[in-house]
């Protein structure tokens, strides 16, 4: 089986202009694999990367989202819309998935806002329980226009994908707690581009460029790595249908590929002197593949090929990571 060439990853350092954006380049890929990988990673990144999200909120003195908030510029609906933009991190070493699955809403760890107006409420005014963190501290939430106390409790948990309002409403049955829809995905944007690149005179490959942006709770490179891990976990049982397949070597190192390509080129491309070139041609040697089947002593016996020409040929082979057979 002809092996696939191992590709290289170019993951740049954090972008100083936008710390939540990452551009990753993957190359060289065989023709067709740019779209295969780019599209598969895209679907997983946008739908299945785990994260944290608000799923309910409680406003002190208010029972539903369609009420105006006295003394606050925004009504409750608009405040909820702003709160849904919170980039929340939850430490899964403290709060596992099972922890939330078995927890009643009245025992839930809550993020709280206790704000004395007037003034502007931002995410930095949120007090988080241990294990919870708000990444986008500058997020605008509301403007309090009067000297009143604003009390808000925010309920969040880990998950993946999107969960609609009705599903969360079934879970939240406590009076005065308002269910919201949830978007757990930390990936805000994913785009990819595939370009053809020339490896040699006759060989083409692809370069896959992924442009990904997150909400800051994880990096773009982390999101891509998690997506690859999810894909790997789904493919592994299929690979294990035949246990012998696990022992197959699918990829080869770049150096091996270069040697393979160099071993099949014409001696016309070695840029030899006329004397050395003519001597090889007259002896029926036309490619490097034929040349490296010779030992040094066999090469020295070729008619009209002197010691200087032999040294020249060996040097040209070395430049292409090739060598003669051992005597």
Curated annotation (Swiss-Prot):
GO cellular component: cytoplasm; DNA-directed RNA polymerase complex
Protein origin, superkingdom: Bacteria
Single Gene Ontology MF annotation: protein dimerization activity
Biological process according to GO: DNA-templated transcription
Record field: catalytic activity: RNA(n) + a ribonucleoside 5'-triphosphate = RNA(n+1) + diphosphate
Keywords: DNA-directed RNA polymerase, Nucleotidyltransferase, Transcription, Transferase
InterPro entries xref list: DNA-dir_RNA_pol_insert (IPR011262), DNA-dir_RNA_pol_RpoA/D/Rpb3 (IPR011263), DNA-dir_RpoA (IPR011773), RBP11-like (IPR036603), RNAP_asu_C (IPR011260), RNApol_insert_sf (IPR036643)
Residue numbers spanned by region Alpha N-terminal domain (alpha-NTD): 1-242
Renumbered residue ranges of the record's region Alpha C-terminal domain (alpha-CTD): 259-327
EC number assigned by the record: 2.7.7.6
Cross-referenced HAMAP family: RNApol_bact_RpoA
Role, per record: DNA-dependent RNA polymerase catalyzes the transcription of DNA into RNA using the four ribonucleoside triphosphates as substrates.
Domain text: The N-terminal domain is essential for RNAP assembly and basal transcription, whereas the C-terminal domain is involved in interaction with transcriptional regulators and with upstream promoter elements.
Similarity-based family: Belongs to the RNA polymerase alpha chain family.
Subunit-structure text: Homodimer. The RNAP catalytic core consists of 2 alpha, 1 beta, 1 beta' and 1 omega subunit. When a sigma factor is associated with the core the holoenzyme is formed, which can initiate transcription.
Protein name: DNA-directed RNA polymerase subunit alpha
Organism name: Ureaplasma parvum serovar 3 (strain ATCC 700970)
């Amino acid at each position: 089986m002809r092996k696939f060439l191992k590709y290289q990853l170019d993951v740049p350092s954090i972008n100083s202009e936008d710390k939540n954006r990452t551009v990753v380049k993957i190359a060289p890929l065989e023709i067709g694999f740019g779209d295969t990988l780019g599209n598969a990673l895209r679907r997983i990144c946008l739908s299945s990367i785990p994260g944290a999200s608000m799923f309910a909120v409680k406003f002190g003195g208010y029972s539903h989202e369609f009420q105006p908030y006295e003394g606050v510029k925004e009504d409750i609906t608009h405040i909820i819309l702003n709160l849904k933009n919170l980039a929340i991190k939850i430490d899964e070493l403290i709060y596992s998935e099972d922890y939330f699955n078995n927890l009643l809403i009245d025992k839930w760890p809550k993020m709280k806002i206790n704000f004395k107006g007037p003034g502007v409420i931002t995410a930095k005014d949120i007090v988080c329980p241990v294990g919870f963190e708000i990444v986008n501290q500058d997020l605008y939430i509301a403007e309090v226009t009067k000297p009143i106390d604003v009390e808000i409790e925010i309920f969040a948990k880990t998950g993946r994908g999107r969960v609609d309002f009705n599903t969360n409403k079934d879970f939240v049955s406590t009076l005065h707690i308002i269910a919201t829809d949830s978007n757990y995905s930390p990936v805000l944007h994913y785009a990819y581009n595939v370009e053809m690149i020339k490896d040699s005179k006759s060989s083409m490959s692809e370069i896959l460029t992924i442009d990904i942006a997150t909400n800051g709770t994880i990096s773009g490179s982390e999101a891509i790595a998690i997506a690859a891990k999810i894909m790997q976990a789904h493919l592994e049982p299929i690979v294990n249908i035949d246990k012998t397949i696990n022992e197959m070597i699918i990829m080869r190192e770049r150096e091996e590929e270069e040697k393979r390509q160099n071993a099949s080129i014409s001696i016309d491309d070695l840029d030899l002197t006329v004397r050395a070139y003519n001597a090889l041609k007259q002896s029926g040697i036309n490619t490097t593949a034929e040349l490296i089947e010779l030992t040094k002593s066999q090469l020295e016996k070729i008619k009209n090929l002197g010691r200087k020409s032999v040294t020249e040929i060996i040097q040209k082979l070395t430049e292409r990571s090739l060598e003669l057979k051992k005597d």
